């Protein structure tokens, strides 16, 4: 078994539940409203449209969140941590590698304006899903690629889109997709200063970058 001390050094190893940090019962305090969508409650309620939720992990959540809030049909976004063991972790705890979480974006969208398939297309094309426990220069289990699905239909769509994108990646000489696709676990929201970070800090770091590979037009969203 890998020791906890080794995980602090080797950023490619996930902890077991027994090794994970204990966390806390109290969630992080969040602002009431979205910084970009002024007047929109960060976590709802959302009264207009046919609302659904999607959860994506594609590297540093600052840049990922910005790309999704820029998409027409998205009504809110929240960044957080998911897929691990530690309840209500801090950013520093997640960066230690001892929570098991990856950085995620919760995307709230109006299905009348943008489909889940559209968002999946964005997800695959915005990052490199073959890199395992890293994304570009960002190394660690918290940067691993994941799709956490809120319904069986989302799970089926995610797997179908993965297979289609894998075919295109293989043609371009890339390796196997390492993206985790699973039913949605609990999402623990990140600290307030992380929410819509690049809107508050336009010159802030953004390490997100795709492969240049696209889904064929027949399989893309709108």
Curated annotation (Swiss-Prot):
InterPro entries: Met_Sox_Rdtase_MsrA_dom, Met_Sox_Rdtase_MsrA_sf, MsrA_MetSO_reductase. Keywords: Oxidoreductase. Signal peptide: none annotated. GO terms for molecular function: L-methionine-(S)-S-oxide reductase activity; peptide-methionine (S)-S-oxide reductase activity. Disulfide bonds: none annotated. Belongs to the MsrA Met sulfoxide reductase family. NCBIfam families: msrA (TIGR00401). This is Peptide methionine sulfoxide reductase MsrA. It comes from Pseudomonas entomophila (strain L48).
């Amino acid at each position: 078994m890998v020791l906890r001390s080794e995980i602090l050094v080797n950023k490619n190893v996930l902890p077991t539940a027994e090794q994970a940090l204990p966390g806390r019962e109290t969630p992080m305090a969040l602002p009431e409203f979205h910084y970009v969508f002024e007047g929109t409650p960060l976590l709802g309620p959302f009264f207009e449209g046919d609302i659904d939720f999607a959860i994506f992990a594609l590297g540093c959540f600052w840049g990922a969140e910005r790309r999704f809030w820029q998409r027409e049909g998205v009504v809110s976004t929240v960044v957080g941590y998911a897929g691990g063991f530690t309840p209500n972790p801090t950013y520093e705890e997640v960066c230690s590698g001892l929570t098991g979480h990856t950085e995620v974006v919760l995307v709230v969208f109006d299905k009348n304006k943008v489909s889940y398939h559209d968002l999946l297309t964005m997800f695959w094309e915005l990052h490199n899903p073959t890199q395992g426990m890293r994304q570009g220069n960002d190394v660690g289990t918290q940067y691993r690629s994941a799709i956490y699905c809120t319904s069986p239909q989302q799970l089926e769509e995610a797997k179908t889109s993965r297979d289609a994108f894998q075919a295109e990646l293989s043609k371009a000489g890339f390796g196997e997709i390492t993206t985790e696709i699973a039913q949605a676990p609990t999402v623990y929201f990140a600290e307030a200063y992380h929410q819509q970070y690049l809107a508050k800090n336009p010159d802030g770091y953004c390490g997100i970058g795709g492969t240049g590979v696209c889904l064929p037009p027949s399989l893309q969203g709108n």
